């Protein structure tokens, strides 16, 4: 039986209290349990956070809460993704220490390892099929997909059964489509699914799951087609620093290219307020091109002051670029 949410938050708070007592020797002024962990304001201008769920996304929330508490030293305890957290911690001017928790024992997290991208399979004929079908071909961490306005409608699969294109929006949809339309020619199948997605991913479309999924990738697709909107001369889709695990999770979308003056740029797009956007964006630049200018592109309504506060905590701050809230209505004309 799943724990009651309130009981889960209480247990998270108790665990953080225990870790602080055992490893930091600070008095706790306030502790709050959350769905994903816990946050604690400590004596001596210090702050502690516990990451129990979605650990790789814990850095932004910890730093934002530390800023509100005027803390100048942050400790993050996590049981998973401590390499990601430690790597991102080094990109901030704030003093951040990451602890790896195993069986109630905390140790200093290992030095962050550089991210390496898995090579994509060499399947030029299948890639050409996606391109000839009018899809945007995107490769991330060895996975090749075909997208329509930023939403995946086809994926190249290479396994023991051979190399092939599976059609559908996400893994479950691909399986269902194969069961119902397994004998349909690939090009025809792509066209059928792509047309449905195009119909729903237009400004005038009624609310629908197909126009709510992957909004950040929809925004990126606009910028790839119209880089001048943010002062760039060329942009191409680029992989995130951590591979996406599913289509439903909102993960900032990344692009790389050149500004009008020729300067290399890494662009990170997001829709909605995301406290972990700045750590993610800084990690994306580190992964793709540490010397590039970093631009964080968000709708104006999502340009919350905490985003700027976190951006200013980076050793090499990004350009935060708010764009029109009606970006879905942009056209290429």
Question: Where are the model-predicted features located?
Answer:
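Charged, terminal alpha-helix-loop-beta segments
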Residues: 1-333
């Amino acid at each position: 039986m799943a724990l009651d949410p309130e009981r889960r938050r209480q247990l998270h708070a108790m665990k953080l209290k225990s870790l602080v007592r055992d490893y930091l020797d600070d008095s706790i002024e306030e502790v709050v349990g959350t769905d994903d962990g816990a946050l604690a304001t400590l004596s001596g201008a210090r702050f502690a956070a516990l990451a129990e769920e979605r650990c790789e996304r814990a850095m932004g929330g910890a730093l934002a809460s530390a800023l509100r508490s005027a803390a100048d030293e942050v400790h993050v305890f996590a049981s998973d993704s401590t390499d990601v957290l430690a790597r991102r911690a080094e990109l901030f001017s704030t003093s951040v220490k990451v602890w790896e928790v195993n069986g109630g024992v905390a140790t200093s997290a290992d030095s962050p390892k550089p991210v390496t991208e898995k090579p994509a399979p060499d399947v030029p004929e299948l890639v050409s099929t996606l391109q000839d079908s009018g899809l945007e071909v995107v490769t991330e961490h060895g996975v090749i997909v075909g997208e329509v306005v930023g939403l995946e409608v086809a994926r190249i699969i290479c396994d023991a059964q051979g190399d092939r294109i599976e059609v559908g929006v996400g893994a479950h949809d691909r399986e269902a489509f194969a069961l119902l339309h397994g004998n349909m020619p690939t090009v025809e199948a792509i066209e059928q699914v792509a047309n449905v997605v195009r119909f729903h991913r237009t400004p005038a479309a009624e609310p629908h799951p197909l126009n709510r999924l992957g909004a950040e990738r929809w925004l990126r697709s606009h910028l790839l087609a119209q880089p001048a909107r943010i002062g760039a001369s060329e942009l191409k889709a680029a992989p995130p620093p951590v591979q996406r695990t599913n289509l439903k999770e909102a993960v900032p979308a990344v692009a790389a290219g050149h500004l009008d003056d020729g300067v290399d740029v890494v662009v990170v797009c997001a829709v909605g307020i995301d406290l972990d956007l700045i750590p993610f964006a800084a990690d994306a630049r580190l992964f793709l091109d540490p010397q590039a200018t970093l631009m964080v592109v968000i709708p104006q309504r999502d340009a919350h002051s905490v985003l700027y506060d976190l951006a200013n905590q980076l050793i090499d701050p990004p350009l935060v670029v708010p764009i029109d809230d009606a970006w879905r209505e942009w056209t290429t004309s």
